[in-house]
């Protein structure tokens, strides 16, 4: 028997597979913390919701990305509920203890349980490949998975892809990365090590953290012994005995919207892991017998597209803790966190050191609305903001707050047949409870 022809191009293969059609009130693309929050909130309030996710788990960087902990904060009832319900699932000394430490396996299960409770339809292993438009009006998204292609028509589409893939394909205006040169923050592949003596272990949780040993200071030793562009130590406690999460790989000059660059970044980071473990064993107290037990299936992309919204949040807004009339996130707090775009550590220009947040700030609803597109909401780190402002609001708790707002707005618009631009932020805040 002759083998099937191998010259059929991808486009021809796609055209040969099954085609389906679905209709829903709200379509959320991407199930990271912001996408989960948007889908859960919209469904909990009574909207029919479909949540599309390319990975095999809900949670994005918080689960598939093996994130160590929730960092940053905002006033978000849903975020607090996640922490509370996670504590109930934790075991041992962390049982019923509210902590920002993440157990990715427990969190995966919790996300699924919560979505099931509110009747959200979930489509895993599914990629958004095109946008269905009528002029500037977004009608839905075309997705593809093992079953074939599906046109999903929605009254409101929420882009929670992190990179703004839906908005970009719809033609929404954006810039990549830093305004001056379009360079973006580096990528990281998280991993965990076991065999750690946690009673003796050193945990350095920031680039500014240092620790002197007989062999030298640990950050300096990391720069010396871990090959560039890695060269720092960031280690975090877990809820598991003897297990530590490492945020220590580093890939620079990466465009997270480019598949080739994502592959390159993954290979770069994975090749660094053995050298990192060797460094930990040789120089860091408590890690003498450590070994890799797991690594992320999703690489951590910190920055890609910044969209032009009805309003673009800037660093001065954050520094002044401006209270916008149309705020939908309040008391957002983090530091300006620009990782070194050319190597390990923080941005070598030190520019973020000139920006010190003193109190919580607000995010206006207008940042979620692309300037020229209808029926589409930006959600999570791809809302409208400058490079520097983005380095502050990109963290997961703040993204959960943004997701709650997006889900609330989508619910109102879809179930009351209203335009996203007509919604008063007070209505959104009332639903969220802030």
Q: Residue locations for each model-derived region?
A:
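Conserved hydrophobic helix-helix packing surfaces used for dimerization/oligomerization
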Residues: 26-28, 49, 376
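N-terminal Rossmann-fold NAD(P) dinucleotide-binding loop
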Residues: 35
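Cationic, low-complexity basic patches in intrinsically disordered or flexible, solvent-exposed regions
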Residues: 3
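Flavin (FAD/FMN)-binding glycine-rich loop and adjacent Rossmann-like elements that form
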Residues: 61, 82, 125, 145, ...
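Conserved N-terminal/central alpha/beta ligand/cofactor-binding core
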Residues: 10-15, 41, 47-48, 52-134, ...
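Conserved beta-strand-loop-beta-strand element in the redox core of flavoprotein oxidoreductases
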Residues: 132-151
